Amino acid sequence: VFARLIREGDLGFCDAYLDGWWSTPDLQAFLDLIHADNDEMYDSFPGMGMVRAWEKFRFWLQSNSKSQAKKNISYHYDLGNDFYKLWLDDTMTYSSAIFESGQESTEKAQLAKYGSLIDQMGAKKGEHILEIGCGWGGFAARLAERTGARLTATTISEEQYKYARERIETLGVADRISIVKQDYRNLTGQFDRVVSIEMIEAVGHEYLPTYFSKIADLLTTEGAAMIQAITMPDHRYSQYLREVDYIRTRVFPGSNVPSISAMVEAVAKKSDLRPTNIFDFGYHCARTLREWRIRFLENEDKIAKLGYDEHFRRAWIYYLC
């Protein structure tokens, strides 16, 4: 293990876990101990230059052009809906919930999150809303239940597209909820509101200005956008961009967790959008991951029976820590 750590850096350490070279009764507690009160530990341990250079080159090849973005999304999201059903809650929501009391189930917390977004955007009957990155249709379904607004929701995942369409048809609201399979950069039209829930992590740093510019173009004059994002602390972002890490190379190719400053700069660079309210949900994100990890571990045997081998399962357990 230590030889791989020296040769391959932090990625070698992660890969050694995936390969079964080391284990621990409580992976989360072990990783928390490594990182406790030591922010520098979050910066990658590079290992040997040639190995790291190869990883960086591979990541560069996965930059989110329109054609590559579809491949990156498919790698992560098209693993099979039955796989995700085993550890997500019944809303099939793959983004942070909001635990208002701390005692509610993940499903109730996800519905509370959707309700909060709908209330904040003030969606009304007759308005047309756009969702960029609709996942399995959780927000679309909740919006249909709560309002009379129209919604166009987009994804480029084949599995999500099929599931979300069937979901909307089953609910009988296909007359006002439309699921489309289209890259956000190809969208046209005018919308009263735009919502994007933890999709920005799939955009890529170099495409952030394009993302916000497209949102601005799609909004009406009095329109507003709501973006839910996992963020990187500003003081770590430059180092993060220079390196590669476990998630971006092993789990979600092409992904990038932006900092708040990076998003604000991207907004100013190519759009006339104006940031207003910011809500920090860091605790809720950590809690959501914990609930997912618990369900994943509880259902690991069922996941294995679907054909996902031990290497794959260990990769996802590590990812959910």
What are these regions (language model features)?
Residues 1-110, 116, 123:
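Feature captures hydrophobic
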Residues 125-133:
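Conserved class I S-adenosyl-L-methionine
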Residues 136-147:
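Conserved SAM-binding loop of SAM-dependent methyltransferases across substrates and taxa
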Residues 164-165:
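Conserved SAM-binding loop
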Residues 185-194:
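A short acidic, Gly/Pro-enriched loop at the edge of an enzyme's catalytic core
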Residues 209-222:
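A short glycine-rich, Lys/Arg-flanked "PGG" loop and its adjoining helix->strand segment in the class I
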Residues 222-230:
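Conserved beta-strand signature within the Rossmann-like core of class I S-adenosyl-L-methionine
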Residues 231-321:
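Substrate-binding/catalytic lobe of Class I Rossmann-like enzymes that use SAM or dcSAM, i.e.
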